[in-house]
Amino acid sequence: MNELTSRLNRERRFLVLLGVICLALIGGALYMQVVLGEAPCPLCILQRYALLFIAIFAFIAAAMPGRKSLTFFEVLVVLSAIGGIVAAGNHVYILANPMVSCGIDTLQPIVDDLPLAKLWPLAFQVDGFCSTPYPPILGLSLAQWALVAFVLTTVLVPLGIYRNRRRG
């Protein structure tokens, strides 16, 4: 096995790990929803979509045989993470400034009309308000943790591409 193949395999393992972590985060959100009674808002659901897209694209990328197809799906992973940054960043802003929320989430009908909301309503249907604060986890709100995860994904995936291909 040459050095480039070894680097690409390391990159693929990282992508599989990233996909598993994203699915675990969705599972954790479902646990908090069902067991702890923390109802998801439209921005929570959009963050779940971003995590799901990251996982799907990461798994597809890990299965790609060539460098170009692998890179294409890694770009989709990063774009999904940027979408997650937008949703989580907006959510963090609303939680920090509850007065900007009018109490009515205008995103709810849009998010509830997305296909997965009809296929799997428990996981992808809106049931709460974005301005509802829940107890922090290790000092950060769930939206802040999601923002950290999306930023790390946006930084680490391109860094891995650069690191694993700079000599290849």
Curated annotation (Swiss-Prot):
HAMAP family: DsbB (MF_00286). GO terms for cellular component: plasma membrane. Pfam families: DsbB. Disulfide bonds join 41-44, 102-130. It comes from the Bacteria. PANTHER family: DISULFIDE BOND FORMATION PROTEIN B. Required for disulfide bond formation in some periplasmic proteins. Acts by oxidizing the DsbA protein. InterPro entries: DiS_bond_form_DsbB/BdbC (IPR003752), Disulphide_bond_form_DsbB (IPR022920), DsbB (IPR050183), DsbB-like_sf (IPR023380). Keywords: Cell inner membrane, Cell membrane, Chaperone, Disulfide bond, Electron transport, Membrane, Oxidoreductase, Redox-active center, Transmembrane, Transmembrane helix, Transport. Belongs to the DsbB family. Its main location: membrane. GO terms for molecular function: electron transfer activity; protein-disulfide reductase activity. It is found in: Cell inner membrane. Residues 32-49, 90-144 are periplasmic. One of its GO terms (biological process) is protein folding. This is Disulfide bond formation protein B 1. The chain crosses the membrane at residues 15-31, 50-65, 73-89, 145-163.
